[in-house]
């Protein structure tokens, strides 16, 4: 039998070394050994330090977990007015000039950490973006930015895969993998793909949902945030402790390449 391959990492709570399946770390490989887990880039992040990158990686896991649970569970998002988000007025003006429609919704999780999903409707396809951040406004801005960034690519993809799109419109059960899912919310598709399980007509200002996502600000306070500054390691430790209170263990592997180490 072909030996299974493991990579050494660390438990974030204790710092103890642990063994991680290789495909969780080097997820773009085609290994010679039989895989028993599907590796993805979920949880991969960069930062100005290992601690900061770890914080962003954990937040991405929270984003993906919240998004998928809401999607599969059809858990309603809380519709939020994109125009009430600070710092995005110029981007929304550009979106309006293009004739696109934008929606934003707060997705809820057990930690009350802010996670937003945004949708851009170009008229031919809907592009989605999602983001988690400890700051409520920061999470909303990042979700909107991601959706806007994805929109041109989604338009090109739908045009290039027109035959596949028509087949999925006829029968969405034909969807086979993750590449098919972005082709479902298109013009002529089923109405259930048209919204974020929230009515845009009921959108509220972002400050109204602040109490439903206060977990992020609580973590910042416990980590000693002062004057907008916080030590990344303290933030990492508070985030890890918050997650592990629900019995979820967290691990990390430093993926930095040698040339990245040389660059600092």
Spans of features found by a protein language model:
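Helix-biased "structured C-terminal domain" signature
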Residues: 1-264
